[in-house]
């Protein structure tokens, strides 16, 4: 048993979608989350910059004595997963490979759409991961940077947001995909609108769910589970825009939580 907390990090509020799954499947675990609101979005930034920001976020979480780290951000996973795995003395997992594994399990026609930030799409991280798992899979990637802004502004259910989603995802109709990877942790916040845009016959895959299952496996194999019984309260930190972050977090997680501001540079 190991009662230390688990660290989660993201460029903004999107990582809360992974946290929500973790709180459901790992109710005994203490979670410490940090969102880099001051410097988001990560998607358009150079890889070297994302690596540096990821190091800084991980360093902050390490001061909280975490026992494992989840990079709850696709852009940061692509840029910094291998770096942080090499540099940190604890298990570090990302969201890309778990997402590809889940999509391969779901698809029936081997046609898989991928929506993500510009950085993740340009890196071809998901097509590469899918090809490693199953060479018969065909990936159809589309950059949807605008979706991040919709989520961060908490405009999830507006008519304007649905119009943007309909326009960006229209091409998937002719591609005849049957599975769509939500390749940015912000995107499950827009799940309802995305499903409406692509139609009911397309299965949406949230990589965060598979990521938490992998986390459970690691905690079990390495005897890192938290003991049953009372645990410390989960902690939430943001590098900027506390009010907006807190509002989204409280609504999405359905908790009366408090977010603390932290300066990282």
Swiss-Prot record:
UniProt binding sites for substrate: 10-11, 42-43, 74-75, 185-186
InterPro entries per UniProt: Asp/Glu/hydantoin_racemase, Asp/Glu_race, Asp/Glu_racemase_AS_1, Asp/Glu_racemase_AS_2, Glu_race
Residue intervals passing through the bilayer: none
GO MF, any single term: glutamate racemase activity
Principal EC category: isomerase
Its EC number(s): 5.1.1.3
Pfam families: Asp_Glu_race
Protein's UniProt keywords contain Isomerase: yes
Reactions that this protein is recorded to catalyse: L-glutamate = D-glutamate
GO biological process, one term: regulation of cell shape
Active site: 73 (proton donor/acceptor), 184 (proton donor/acceptor)
Pathway(s) of this molecule: Cell wall biogenesis; peptidoglycan biosynthesis
UniProt KW keywords: Cell shape, Cell wall biogenesis/degradation, Isomerase, Peptidoglycan synthesis
Keyword Iron: no
Classification via PROSITE patterns: ASP_GLU_RACEMASE_1, ASP_GLU_RACEMASE_2
Gene3D superfamilies, sorted: 3.40.50.1860
Function of the protein: Provides the (R)-glutamate required for cell wall biosynthesis.
Family: Belongs to the aspartate/glutamate racemases family.
Name of the protein this chain belongs to: Glutamate racemase
Organism of provenance: Pediococcus pentosaceus (strain ATCC 25745 / CCUG 21536 / LMG 10740 / 183-1w)
């Amino acid at each position: 048993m190991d009662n230390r907390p688990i660290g989660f990090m993201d460029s903004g509020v999107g990582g809360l979608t992974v946290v929500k799954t973790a709180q459901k499947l790992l109710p005994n675990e203490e979670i410490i989350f940090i969102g880099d609101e001051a410097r988001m979005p990560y998607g358009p930034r150079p890889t070297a910059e994302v690596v540096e920001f990821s190091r800084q976020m991980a360093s902050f979480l390490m001061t909280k004595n975490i026992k494992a780290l989840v990079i709850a951000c696709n852009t940061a996973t692509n840029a910094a997963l291998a770096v942080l795995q090499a540099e940190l003395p604890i298990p570090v997992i990302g969201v890309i490979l778990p997402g590809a594994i889940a999509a391969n399990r779901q698809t029936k026609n081997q046609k898989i759409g991928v929506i993500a930030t510009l950085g993740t799409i340009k890196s071809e991280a998901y097509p590469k991961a899918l090809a490693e798992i199953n060479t018969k899979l065909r990936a159809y990637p589309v950059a949807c940077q605008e979706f991040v802004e919709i989520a961060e502004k908490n405009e999830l259910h507006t008519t304007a947001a649905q119009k943007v989603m309909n326009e960006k995802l229209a091409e998937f109709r002719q591609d005849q995909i049957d599975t769509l990877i939500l390749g940015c942790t912000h995107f499950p916040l827009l799940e309802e609108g995305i499903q409406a845009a692509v139609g009911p016959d397309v299965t949406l895959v949230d990589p965060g769910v598979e990521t938490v299952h992998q986390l459970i496996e690691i905690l079990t194999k390495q005897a890192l589970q938290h003991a049953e019984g009372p645990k410390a309260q989960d902690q939430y930190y943001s590098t900027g825009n506390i009010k907006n972050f807190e509002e989204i977090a409280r609504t999405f997680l359905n908790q009366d939580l408090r977010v603390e501001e932290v300066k990282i540079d």
